[in-house]
Structure formats: structure tokens, C-alpha cells
Amino acid sequence: DAIAEKRPKIVFISGPSSSGKTTFSKRLQIQLLVDGIKPEVLSMDDYFVNRVDTPRDENGQLDFETVNAMDLPFFRQQMHDLLDGKEVDLPTYDFGKGERVFEGRKLKLQKDSVLVIEGLHALNPIILPDVERSLTFKIYVSALTTINIDNHNWIPTTDIRLLRRVVRDYKYRGYSAKETIARCPSVVRGEQKWVYPFQEEADVMFNSALIFEFAVLKRHAEPILSEVPKFCEEYTEAHRLLKFLQYFIPIPEKEIPPTSLLREFVGGSSFHY
């Protein structure tokens, strides 16, 4: 309703890894249609540079978290063309090939259209420095769980996102729990440098945590985490998560509606990703 009242030209959606940005943007799209606004949802992931051009971190590893992993000049040009009423040929990033491809996706904004841009760096002013702030509406999404184990032991907000990521990466990206856990330090460094400093830019903050989701993730995460070999350094974290999940009784997946944000990670969503 705030977006319908303000009528911005661009809605930015950002948040840390596995916060549910993609499903949030799709559900927001439906609500905007109800409010008589035509949303055009774009993912900033489609504007990554080709993998061979991806910057490397201090350890020589590919750094996908930095804003410099995006083709900012190309992104800015397309956004300005859209705002000027021009038609653009939208890219799609092929993660398998590690390169940007063009599949004939054309877009031209209509009078009642609004761009909805979702991505890790969406709240960073550097991505579109020439666009007036009054023309934008910024949303920060994160999973801030409100439950504790007891009166003395709180649940880190990073745990819920890590479990989401372990399940999603195994099901849809072909990564083992060992590989996902091994990438955690890089992901966390990226969030601390490129996401958290800009959360105060947001007009609205949305908590995507669900009170029942540990009980749902348990059934999916336990067998995946159990595959982590005992001799590797990632085993300690996998074992900690397995011990933590013992506190929860699993919930049958059939109880979770297909439009639930949790479906982005466990599957069975009515949305296309």
C-alpha cells in the first residue's frame, strides 16, 4: 500500500543470502497487480560479469559477493533506457556456463509500470547513483527468528539462513553441505561489507522468518548434513547444526502452502524460480 501511495519508478529489494528475496519479490508482484500497478521484476543476478571476468578475493578465490562482480555500466545503461521509455533486450545469467546470455526477453515500461529490482546489492546507492531517491522505494528482507531454545540460549539469526542455503544448494545447485559450509566465511564477509552497511537505506524492513520453519527444514537438512565426512573441517559445523535440529519435531511438508516463502528452499512452490 505504501508503494501504491508513493508510486515510485523503482522498488529495490535487498537482504543477506537466503533471506527469501526472490519469493518476496514474486509475492509483492501479485500485491502490486491488485493495487493497479504493473510490476516488472528483474534480478540483479542476471547482470553478473562472465565468470572469467569475476574478481578474486585476497585468497585468490572467485568473489561473487562483491559489487564489482556485477557489470555495473551495462546495468545502469539498461535501467536508464527503461526509465527513458526505451525497449531493452534483457540478459539472463547462465550459472552453468558462467556467462550472460540473451534469449529474446524484451522489456519496455508502460505508464503504470514499476521496476522491481531484487538482489544482494539493491540498496547500495552506487548501483544507480543518478536516479533521484524520491523515485525509489527500498525494502530490506532478512530472516530474524523470534524463538529461543530456552531463556538463556538464543538462536543466531544466521542459523536459519544457513539451513535454508544448505537445503536449497543441495536440491537446486548441486552443492553438498560440505561445500555450502565451506563457502560460509566468504558469504559472511560479503554480507558484512556489501549488505549490512546499507540496510538503513531501506524504507521498510521485512522479517521473512517463519516460526515453524526449523521443524520443516529438519526433515530436509538432516540427511544432507549427515553426508559431511567426519575427517573434514566442515564436520564441526555440520554436527552442531544436526544437534540443534534435534530440538524440533518435524512437520509434514503437505502442511506448507505452495505460496509460502519456505517453498523457495524446500521445493514445491507455485512460483517459478
Each language-model region and where it sits:
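Glycine-rich phosphate-binding loop used to anchor ATP phosphates in small-molecule kinases
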Residues: 5, 76-134, 181-198, 270
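Hydrophobic anchor at the beta1->P-loop junction of P-loop NTPases
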Residues: 11-13
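Walker A (P-loop) phosphate-binding loop of P-loop NTPases
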Residues: 18
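Conserved lysine of the Walker
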Residues: 21
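Post-Walker A helix-loop "phosphate-sensing" segment adjacent to the P-loop in P-loop NTPases
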Residues: 30-40
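Conserved nucleotide-sensing/catalytic segment adjacent to the nucleotide-binding pocket
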Residues: 40-42, 49-98, 114
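Conserved NTP phosphate-binding and transfer environment spanning the P-loop NTPase/kinase superfamily
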Residues: 125-273
